[in-house]
């Protein structure tokens, strides 16, 4: 049994965490982490990306990750931490933009969309590859979160999507199913070369949120 994060002497004990399983953090824990980080993120954007400025955090983003994750038995708290890493605290200073509601770089390969990309049965009123942009765009925050969770589900298990869950990830079928049951198994798969990718999600974002104190950043 893993120790409580506040009692853990070494974060590496969490490197064996599975993608599937129960949340350890609550939505309130994750929201408190974002709230505590806001001043730091505002400074970061002002200093490094003044032309972009601060983008408000998506509404209810922590709760959405927790609740949608439960539907798929995916650890939504870790998925949230991955989203924080991928988006730069939801500031999107890379090629994916905040209005795309794409929290994990889904479909963003570094080459701009042509608009001819396959949607593989995904409702195009909910998701699209907009020509000239990078990666998928979703019409709501909720759809974007669920697509992220589904992509993790593809890596973590060979099971079909849970009943009553609509496919939102057009890249779901491109994943070798079940190849990454652990977060650290995403190394070299989700990100290339991706050395230490899973460890970074756990250590630099999730563990920091779990050990939040008044002096954070």
Description of each model-found segment:
Residues 2-217:
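Catalytic cores of secreted/periplasmic lytic hydrolases that degrade extracellular macromolecules
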């Amino acid at each position: 049994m893993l120790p409580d994060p506040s009692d853990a002497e070494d974060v590496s004990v969490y490197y064996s965490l599975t993608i599937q399983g129960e949340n350890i953090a609550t939505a309130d824990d994750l929201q408190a982490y974002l709230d505590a980080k806001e001043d730091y993120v505002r400074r970061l954007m002002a200093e490094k990306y003044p032309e972009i400025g601060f983008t408000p955090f998506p509404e209810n983003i922590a709760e959405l990750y927790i609740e949608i994750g439960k539907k798929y038995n995916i650890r939504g708290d870790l998925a949230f931490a991955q989203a924080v890493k991928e988006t730069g605290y939801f500031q999107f200073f890379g090629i994916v933009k905040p209005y795309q509601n794409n929290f994990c770089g889904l479909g963003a390969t570094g080459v701009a969309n042509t608009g001819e990309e396959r949607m593989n049965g995904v409702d195009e009123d909910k998701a699209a590859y907009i020509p000239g942009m990078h990666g998928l765009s979703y019409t709501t925050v909720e759809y974007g979160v669920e697509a992220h969770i589904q992509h993790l589900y593809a890596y973590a298990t060979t099971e079909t999507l849970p009943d009553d869950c609509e496919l939102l990830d057009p890249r779901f079928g491109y994943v070798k199913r079940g190849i990454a049951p652990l977060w650290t198994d995403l190394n070299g798969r989700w990100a290339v070369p991706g050395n230490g990718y899973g460890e970074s999600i756990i250590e630099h974002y999730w563990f920091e949120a779990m050990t939040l104190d008044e002096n954070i950043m």
